[in-house]
Amino acid sequence: TIMGLFLKDIILKGKTALVTGATKGIGRGTAIALAQAGANIIAVGRNQTELDSLQKIIKKLKVKYHSFNCDVNDFELMKKYISKIKKLDVLVNNAGTNIPEPFLNVKKSSVETILNVNTKAVFNVAQLCANQIIKLNKKGGSIINISSIFGIVAGQNRTVYSMSKFGVEGLTKGMALDLAKYNIRVNSVCPNIVLTPRTKKYFANRNYNRYVKENTPLNKTVTISDVATSIAFLASDASSMITGTSIIIDGGWTAR
């Protein structure tokens, strides 16, 4: 299963979670993991075929499923959708992108694309969902922003990506302070490179496993399940005293 060892300890029954970027990779795996833990799922993505495919999986888990076919950069459409939600406890702010380029050759269009998706849209969706949680739920909620180890350290050919993810880290801490009085916890997860269809394509002409393992003390790569399990923990009441922090999922990469 997507979850792993601690599924039995993470109970999300009765909670509703909105997951952006839910059609593939970490977002898809997280939506399934949260559903396995009992959460009802609202999936946001741009590929209707994949949203329908996810629905078939989620429905088998006996929880509710709704989806919005929407680009997170479309603020007005996201606002329209989120304002219609009748129950919301958890946001997984996952949508993201990267265009690896050396600093001296970074295109202006790349900067705009990366910052719009990775930072501006994360801010906008978080603000919309936080207001909706406050409106609907006196008990508060949990917001998990998907960051990266490159929001903690730099990476070659990832200058703009790092800039965007460092922004997410600052956003997470600021939100945690401002939303604490509403009992809304805000945290981030910072995974190392996860092997997804997108990263497989990027590393097609490189020895991915060798590269990652040689730089990871635990000598293994991060999986979608590793990330989804941590997100489920932060979404659950088991993490009720955790806010304003980051869970680094990197096998020791950043400890060097």
Show where each model-derived region lies.
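Conserved glycine-rich cofactor-binding loop
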Residues: 16, 23-25
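Conserved glycine-rich Rossmann-like NAD(P)H-binding loop of the short-chain dehydrogenase/reductase
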Residues: 39-53
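Active-site helix of classical SDR
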Residues: 126, 164, 172
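Residue(s) in the substrate-gating loop at a strand-loop-helix junction
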Residues: 148
